[in-house]
Amino acid sequence: MPSFKTLDDLSDIRGKRVLVRVDLNVPVKDGKVTDVTRIERVAPTILELSEKGAKVILLAHFGRPKDGPSSDLSLSLIAPSVEEVLDHAVLTASDCIGEAAASAVAAMNDGDILLLENTRFHKGEENNDSDFTKALAANGDIYVNDAFSAAHRAHASTEGLAHHLPAYAGRTMQAELEALEKGLGDPARPVVAIVGGAKVSTKIDLLMNLVKKVDALVIGGGMANTFIAARGTNVGKSLCEHDLAETAKQIMIEAATAGCAIILPEDGVIAREFKAGAANETVDINAIPADAMVLDVGPKSVEAINAWIERAATLVWNGPLGAFEIGPFDAATVAAAKYAAGRTIAGKLTSVAGGGDTVSALNHAGVADDFTYVSTAGGAFLEWMEGKELPGVAVLNAAAA
């Protein structure tokens, strides 16, 4: 297990200035936050520190500002939603460094919560500039990183600060790292991975890493067509990266060498147009008509996938099995998700899932809360699945050494 310090290692923090890196990169429409999930995830850390009397100073980025500050990317837009979720007053500052930040921090009382302005309004944030990092650190006594979703970036507020202040993992970061350790770090075996989505090209590193770590790899979604075509099967008009046939073959060779079973669809649900309620039928995967496209894996394939889930002690899931956004091509994803959720509830399976489409698919199936852990981290979750070291995590481990 990676070793890092958590809030449990913090004692007597009353009056201490705690810089907390959080992920507040939430969707906003017409000036209003439309989804507060990320705020809800960091609420326990913020409130725990506040209740212990710390001066809680929140650091976050929002969007991708191109040329310094812009009002439409100001965290002042997010502050009311943070207040609402926390049920606690949230102070704001017009900058994250300099006099504006320093005077706002100086005016804080014990237990106060202050949201500093968007760190990306300064180029030094993404450059991990040492002067900018020192300017951030000047307002804190302790650093807590609760933004696993930004841990794959070596930025000033995600990595740099841990070199200047005592560094700890927040509750969300801790939960994410402990769940990921159970998923791939030191999992109960057998381990089955489900990888879906449209393209092999975006997941080559992930697939190459997984075949060395899991006992079976289920491939679904559009990317399955690339593997099926690489075997010499006609996939009709299905989404397929024919130019990656050799890559697909190489992944299958690596899997065979590592003793990892590759599970590809045996049947598919085909249609001639990509729209909700399109006329469709189920065919054997070797009998796809030239004018049709596969939009979901078929019932025989779902049975095979569920049999692997039945055998598994650990399941890692990234990407839907079909075009789940439009019915009826959500059937396989929903069926497998519900089966995995049932095994998890019964205490037979540790299930870890992540990636934007995956979270949407599990919500669509109504089982996101029934998985052991569902990561909302996106890019950081994928890089972890690829076996890459995450700078924001590595620096916490180093700080605890």
UniProtKB/Swiss-Prot annotation:
InterPro entries cross-referenced by the UniProt entry: Phosphoglycerate_kinase, Phosphoglycerate_kinase_CS, Phosphoglycerate_kinase_N, Phosphoglycerate_kinase_sf
GO BP: gluconeogenesis; glycolytic process
Main location: cytoplasm
Binding site for substrate: D23, L24, N25, R38, H61, F62, G63, R64, R120, R153
One GO term describing the cellular component: cytosol
Alphabetized UniProt keyword annotations: ATP-binding, Cytoplasm, Glycolysis, Kinase, Nucleotide-binding, Transferase
EC number(s) on file: 2.7.2.3
Top-rank taxon: Bacteria
MF-aspect GO terms: ADP binding; ATP binding; phosphoglycerate kinase activity
Involved pathway(s): Carbohydrate degradation; glycolysis; pyruvate from D-glyceraldehyde 3-phosphate: step 2/5
Residues that, per the record, bind ATP: K203, E325, G355, G356, D357, T358
Reactions catalysed, as given in the entry: (2R)-3-phosphoglycerate + ATP = (2R)-3-phospho-glyceroyl phosphate + ADP
Subcellular location: Cytoplasm
Complex and partners: Monomer.
HAMAP family assigned: Phosphoglyc_kinase
Family label: Belongs to the phosphoglycerate kinase family.
Protein name as annotated: Phosphoglycerate kinase
